[in-house]
Amino acid sequence: MKNRTALLMAVMVLTMSCSLLAQAPKAPATVTSVLDRSLSGMEGEFVPAAEAMPEDKYSFVPSTGEFKGVRTFSQQVKHVAAVNYLVAASVLSEKPPVDTGGENGPDSAKSKADIVKFLKDSFAYAHKAVATINDTNSVSDIKSPFGEGTTTRLSMGVLLVGHGFDHYGQMVEYLRLNGIIPPASRQ
């Protein structure tokens, strides 16, 4: 009987301990965590969309309607990756670690594999930059990556996410015009 009572008490203590641990308050959100989570969310939709388009369709551009001068699918992907690098480098106050080819991506990235690698590497670099944005430096002036003037780290962190989603929306149309359901819509 004593063993049963001791066992019952041990189970109750463990259960209560687990309940208390499960109810522990979450750490408050920070500028860094919010930006990183947002960037991860965008990356989680953008990269699979880039991977979903077959390589032979990477040069696709809509042709019916008013689409003169719009980017091809590969140019969309390269542009977002290049801007990721430029913006992240601005946040880090350094030069991009790779040739970005300006805002259009490097001419050397031609195959789907090269372009997707350039894209994934740009997101890794963007996460590195976002990790440095905090309450202390988020609104400090930094040099704008787009010419003269200044901006803030926070605005550049927001731009990383917003810019990617802007082009993601265009890429979704390119995918659908080719009979491909975007990966994020398949779930």
Positions of predicted regions on the chain:
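Positively charged n-region of N-terminal signal peptides that target proteins for export
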Residues: 1-5
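Bacterial N-terminal signal peptides
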Residues: 8-19
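Cleaved targeting-peptide boundary
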Residues: 23-31
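Short, contiguous alpha-helical
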Residues: 36, 40-47, 59-103, 143-187
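Well-ordered alpha-helical scaffold segments within catalytic/enzyme domains
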Residues: 45, 49-50, 88, 125, ...
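Short, flexible helix-adjacent loops and helix caps
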Residues: 54-58, 92, 135-138
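Acidic/histidine-rich alpha-helical segments that form the ligand environment
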Residues: 107-144, 152-164
